[in-house]
């Protein structure tokens, strides 16, 4: 998809391409929060593909003469996010499970650390990057570096916000999951005027209220897992969601 977009941009003489990469580009690092100058070490095909899209865009920019910005949003959450997908969007998954009367599922001991970006705080920096000449050719993290939270604590926070007396279920870790992953917002503050205006509690509350309004759903498995082995999480094999 990325290659098709970049090719269309070149063919149609688009002056600037804004590429949304992913924090998955960083992989496992010795330093947190992740800064844009760290050597990427993606741990999964998604992260590898995102990094490849950045590199492809830079090459095409050099050849075809358009400007580009690589934005690196991380863990975007908000109302209208798909919440019946059992594989991604941990906040929405937990809320949907709890509203269906089921406890949240936590992989491993839940000590994995993340930051979550409310969609309202992500939109403005993206728009700003379109017009900001200082951002041209740059890779810029988009999202907060406040409210760092473990997945275990996240599950209890969501339970508290929903006034639920359920307890999390802890299952085996997922393979290739990065343990500590959160990004510095210093560069986006400097170049794009990034500012966190919606904290994690408020963001979770917005999502929960929206899911309550439209109604919780059963999780949908659209495709079977291509290759099963001993490392495939039991939650995926047995469709525990």
Can you describe what each PLM-predicted range is?
Residues 3-44:
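Conserved Rossmann-fold NAD(P)-dependent oxidoreductase catalytic core, especially the SDR/UDP-sugar
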Residues 109, 137-141, 149-155, 163-180, ...:
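C-terminal "lid/loop" region of Rossmann-like NAD(P)-dependent oxidoreductases
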Residues 21-22, 54-79, 140:
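Conserved beta-loop-beta element that borders a ligand/cofactor-binding pocket
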Residues 51, 64, 76-92, 102, ...:
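Glycine/proline-rich active-site loop of Rossmann-fold NAD(P)-dependent oxidoreductases
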């Amino acid at each position: 998809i990325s290659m098709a977009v970049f090719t269309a941009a070149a063919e149609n003489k688009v002056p600037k391409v804004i590429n949304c990469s992913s924090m998955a580009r960083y992989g496992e690092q010795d330093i947190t929060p992740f800064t844009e100058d760290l050597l990427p070490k993606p741990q999964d095909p998604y992260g590898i593909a995102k990094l490849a899209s950045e590199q492809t865009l830079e090459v095409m920019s050099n050849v075809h003469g358009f400007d580009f910005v690589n934005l690196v949003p991380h863990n975007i959450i908000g109302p209208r996010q798909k919440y019946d997908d059992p594989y991604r969007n941990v906040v929405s998954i937990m809320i949907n499970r709890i509203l269906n009367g089921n406890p949240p599922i936590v992989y491993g001991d839940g000590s994995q650390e993340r930051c979550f970006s409310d969609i309202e705080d992500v939109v403005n920096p993206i728009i700003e990057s379109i017009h900001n000449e200082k951002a041209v050719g740059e890779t810029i993290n988009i999202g907060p570096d406040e409210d760092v939270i473990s997945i275990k604590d996240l599950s209890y926070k969501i339970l508290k916000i929903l006034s639920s007396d359920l307890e999390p279920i802890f299952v085996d870790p997922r393979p290739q999951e990065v343990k500590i992953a959160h990004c510095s917002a210093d560069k986006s503050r400097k170049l794009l005027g990034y500012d966190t205006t919606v904290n994690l509690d408020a963001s979770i509350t917005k999502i929960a209220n929206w899911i309550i309004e439209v109604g919780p759903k059963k999780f949908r498995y659209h495709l079977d897992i291509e290759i099963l082995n001993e490392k495939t999480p039991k939650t995926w094999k047995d469709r525990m969601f």
